[in-house]
Every structure is written in C-alpha cells, then in structure tokens.
Design a protein with these regions (language model features):
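Short beta-strand->loop structural element characteristic of the AMP-binding/adenylate-forming
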Residues: 109-119, 336
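Helix C-cap/helix->beta junction micro-motif
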Residues: 106, 159-160, 331
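Active-site phosphate-binding strand-loop segment of PLP-dependent enzymes
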Residues: 118-200, 205-215, 370
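PLP-dependent aminotransferase class I/II
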Residues: 48-53, 61-64, 125, 137-141, ...
Length: 398
C-alpha cells in the first residue's frame, strides 16, 4: 500500500523545515567581519582591492570591480558596453528580472530568446534568430550554475559585432571547457546574495579582461568620479583633487562585506564539492522516477550548482506543479520556483510584451520546482528531500 503524503493526511517525512537555500557561516567568517570593524576602514578601504585580487585569482580574469549587488553589476556592465536608447539586448526569460532590467535602465529594449529545453539555458540558435541591426549585446545567464554554451554565443557575438555579458549570479567557481567562466565573456557579473554559493550578505562584481571596459566599470561604480590624472580634463589642483567625468552611481561595496566574502571564497571549493555530492545523490534517486525529469548537464561545464531544478512530468502525474509544490511543503520541505518568465510580469506587459514569446521557457515554468540545496544540509536532510519526492511521485502517479 502506498504511503499517504502529509498533504493527504499522512505523516510528514520530518517535523522541522528544510530551507531551499541558506548561507553557511563559521567562526572564520565572523572573525573576518570583526577584523574589519576594528580596522580604520569600513568602506573604500584595502579589503576591496584584496577581494578584487582574490576574484581575479579564482576566475583568471585580468580585472574585477566589486559592487553593492548583482543588479548593480549588470547595470554598470551594460553602461560600460555603451548600451543606450534604441538598442536591443538579448537575454533569457528564465532568470531573475535584473538580467533584463539592466537593459531598461540604459534605455534599451530587452529581447527574449528561448531556452534549450534539456539544459534550461539560453539557446544559441534562438539568440541568432533574434539578432537585428539594433542588437548591442547578449546577456547569457548561467542558469543553476551551469555554464551557458559560451563558444556558440561568442561566435554569434563576434559575427555580429556584439558584446557578450555573462550573468554568472549562479556560477562562481564554474568552469567551461576547463576555463573559469568569469574570464571567457567580454564581461561576467556575479552576485553574492545569502542563498548563493558564497555570500557577502549583499554584493556583486564584474569581471573583464578588457582594460577600457574596466576603466568604465570603475567610473560607473563611484558616481563617474575619478582621481586618476590620466582621465581628467586638466592638471589637478592638488592631491585632494578629483573630477566627475561621467554620470555614475554609488554602487560601492563596503569593506565589511568584502572581508566576509574573502573568507567565504576561501571555502569555495569545499562548498562546490558538497553541493555536487547533494546533486549527484538527487540525480541518482530521481533519474529512475518517470513522474519527474532531471535537468541535463553539458559535459563542457564543470558546474558549481547553485540550484537543483526538479521538473515534473505532467504525462505521468495526476497533480500539477502547484499541487506537487504544496505537497512538498506539507512534508516540511521548503521549495521555490526559479523562475517566472520575466515578460509575464505586469510591468513588462505594460511595455507590450505578451505570453507566447518563448514556448519552451513557458512550458518549463509550468513544471519546475527548486529543491533544497546548500552546503549546510546534512545527509539526513538530503535523504528526507528524496523520500518526500518519491512518496509524492508514487502516490500521485498516473
């Protein structure tokens, strides 16, 4: 006899909730923050440069610009790319809104390309089909941490004179064909929100190998103000002198955040390894269940997994995604959905976007659930998630 799920009156697999994501902090992290608090600089200090050097070391990129969050990173990347009024920026709808909003911030139009329905990343062929004479850049998201197909995307961008910006909010530590993702595209942005693999509380960064882009990114981060005499309109009045040479923003990261993030980055490989262990265990358990579908991983990507996406198979279930999601919640397994297609939002609808633009992305949205995945999960936690999925899938199987 099939075990009854908690939502149908059965007993939950556990009595306490498992978060879908959670920061993982230890004494070294606490000490790193305390050390900054006891120092002379809480912001605009030496920890920022130390962090930027650390990010360059990890990614292999020549330059890093630390900023206040991942959205700020995307914004200044678009500004540095020269994106403006009348331009178009191609991106995926299966992402957080910031990946498209960054184009709007610059007066440009986001254009949504469809996804590969196996990997869930942006489909290079769909990107190619959406290139017009107005296209200025492609913002490709490393969804769940898996690298986008960068070779194909770079080929398209070079063919049409476009810049490739990788939204690597999920993918710090990921490698594509053996090369860290932060050093491949023209610019790569990172996010360090608490549910990401490493965190600064809030924080972001832009990586590039291009010195001219780096100079622009640095300006846009700090009001468009510089103390570099080479960028000034005239000889400085003295050592105190600075000039605003462009319209920038206050997107600076604090030294407190940088200190925490440096400590977190020291554990990046540890975090990556544990997340991979959990993903492998999930894959092994779910691959043989016809009621659910496992995300395909490309062999070129050595992935730091930020999210674990479970896709339900409507042909094999008598419940839909919402009911499956709520059934997991009743088992005390807290899940999420990543993502609602960006152009579904009322703001985008007011701009003239309509459903039907990206059929594969829209179908994916109807069927996905993000399961718990973070370093601090115990083996028991992982087993409980697996048991809950198996119980629900079996009970509601067609």
């Amino acid at each position: 006899m099939l075990e009854k799920p908690a939502v149908a009156g059965g007993t939950p697999v556990r009595n306490t909730k498992i978060f879908y994501g959670h920061q993982c902090l230890d004494e070294a992290d606490y000490q790193a923050v305390l050390d900054v608090l006891k120092s002379d600089y809480l912001t605009c200090g030496p920890k920022i440069e130390e962090l930027e050097r650390k990010l360059c070391e990890i990614t292999g990129a020549r330059y890093a610009v630390a900023v206040s969050n991942g959205t700020a990173a995307l914004h200044i990347a678009c500004l540095a790319a020269g994106i403006g009024e009348g331009d178009e920026v191609i991106t995926t709808p299966i992402t957080f809104a910031a990946s498209a909003n960054c184009a709007l911030y610059c007066g440009a139009k986001p254009v949504f390309a469809d996804i590969n329905d196996k990997t869930y990343n942006i489909d290079p062929e769909s990107v190619r089909q959406h290139v017009t004479e107005r296209t200025k850049a492609v913002v490709a998201v490393d969804y769940t941490g898996q690298s986008a197909q960068l070779d194909e995307l770079l080929e398209i961008c070079r063919e049409h004179g476009l810049l490739l910006i990788t939204d690597g909010a999920h993918s710090i530590g990921t490698k594509y064909k053996g090369q860290p993702t932060g050093s491949i595209a023209d610019m790569t942005t990172f996010s360090f929100h608490p549910v990401k693999t490493v965190t600064a509380g809030e924080g972001g960064a832009v990586m590039t190998n291009d010195e001219a882009l780096y100079q622009k990114l640095s300006l846009f981060r700090t009001h468009g103000i510089t103390r570099n005499p080479a960028l000034m309109s005239r000889e400085p009045d003295g050592s105190w002198y600075y000039e605003q040479v462009d319209l920038g923003y206050n997107y600076r990261m604090t030294d407190i955040q940088a200190g925490l993030l440096i400590s977190q980055l020291n554990k990046l490989e540890l975090f990556k390894s544990r997340r991979r262990e959990i993903v492998n265990k999930y894959n092994a358990a779910f691959s043989g269940i016809p009621q659910v579908i496992v995300q395909e991983e490309i062999p070129e990507s050595d992935t730091t997994r930020h999210l674990y996406i479970l896709r339900i198979n409507p042909e094999k279930l008598c419940i839909d995604r919402k009911e499956f999601f709520e059934a997991l919640g009743a088992e005390n397994i807290c899940c999420n959905v990543h993502y609602i297609p960006v152009y579904y939002f009322p703001y985008y609808q007011k701009l003239g976007y309509e459903k039907g633009l990206c059929p594969k992305a829209e179908k994916l949205y109807e069927e996905i659930i993000s399961l718990p995945l973070y370093y601090g999960m115990s083996d028991r936690d992982v087993d409980d998630v697996i048991t809950a999925v198996q119980k629900i899938a079996a009970y509601y199987a067609k």
